[in-house]
């Protein structure tokens, strides 16, 4: 009985792992920010709860499809070889059915508790990641994460539209921030895992163009990100608190990118990658804090 229960727990954990919960949580932080930034009043509990649940379920479904498509690649890479599908703990067909169930439930929640525009934009984001990026771009071009990054940048727009019911310039600016953040984030990881990507025949930029070229582009994109991150203040979407945070966080990110560009230290790339995660989290928290500070004035 104890053995049977441990197997069941492992299966439950395997299916949870397929949804990439840590990635989904970061996405939901940005969708939450989009929701709260969209209004001067409070967000209704139904939109807050079921809107984010729907977005999260669809994101989880897309992540499962990514695991299915990449299972052979994952088996070749040290970072991913222990994933459930790569090790055969979950079969592809049950995983795809699980992905379909997550996506359908997410779409139903969005249609019922938010609005049709949010649901269709979420579906477009899901298909962009699961089909366009995972199925084609990842194996086709070293610009895979630049082109495919738009799908991963959508959550703040989805959260905003869930509350407002329409697309406007402000949420598109939030999308632009994540879009500019994506290349330095993933290319830093790609440098750290260059040999693994080469072994799996994935044309990541460090594999196709070399580390020096990639480091230069990380530096350039970090400069672009710093400039883009100041636009919410420039258009009076945010105030001085956000400006100070964006400058501090952005300059620190630029420092990491410069160190990576100038240094051959083996841990510089993974250090840049880890900082980029904290950067995005802190930047969106700053947006929220500034928003409610402005409302209280």
From Swiss-Prot:
Pathway membership: Porphyrin-containing compound metabolism; heme O biosynthesis; heme O from protoheme: step 1/1
Source domain of life is Bacteria
Q: Where are the transmembrane segments?
A: 23-43, 45-65, 93-113, 117-137, 145-165, 171-191, 216-236, 241-261, 277-297
Reaction catalysed by this chain?
Answer: heme b + (2E,6E)-farnesyl diphosphate + H2O = Fe(II)-heme o + diphosphate
Q: Name one Pfam family in it.
A: UbiA
Q: What is its EC number?
A: 2.5.1.141
Share any extra remarks.
Answer: Carbon 2 of the heme B porphyrin ring is defined according to the Fischer nomenclature.
Family the entry assigns: Belongs to the UbiA prenyltransferase family. Protoheme IX farnesyltransferase subfamily.
> How is this protein named in the record?
Protoheme IX farnesyltransferase 1
